[in-house]
Amino acid sequence: MMFTPLIVLTLLVLATAEHQCGPNEQWSDCPKCELQCGESDKPCATICGEPKCYCSPDKYRRIPDGRCIRKIQCPQH
């Protein structure tokens, strides 16, 4: 029975680790829209996407490095 606490601890660590987001990102269980540099006119989905970290509402995803940045930092702004 000594393995039970170890298993619980491992599951807890794994569950919290997947919610670690990068700078200017936040976790959502139901992301619907994420702005991307160069695609500000792209319509947003009305259904939930896959749970993930996505850019904060006032930030844009820069391609190809995937960082979340201010709109003015987007290439060719």
Curated annotation (Swiss-Prot):
UniProt keyword annotation of Disulfide bond present: yes
Cystine connections: C21-C53, C30-C48, C33-C44, C37-C74, C55-C68
Site entry: Reactive bond: T46, I47
Gene3D superfamilies: Laminin (2.10.25.10)
Residue span(s) of domain TIL: 21-74
Signal peptide: 1-17
GO molecular function: serine-type endopeptidase inhibitor activity
Alphabetical keyword list: Disulfide bond, Protease inhibitor, Secreted, Serine protease inhibitor, Signal
Top-level taxonomic group: Eukaryota
Subcellular location: Secreted
GO cellular component entries: extracellular region
Stated role: Defends the organism against the host's proteinases.
Protein name (database record): Serine protease inhibitor 2
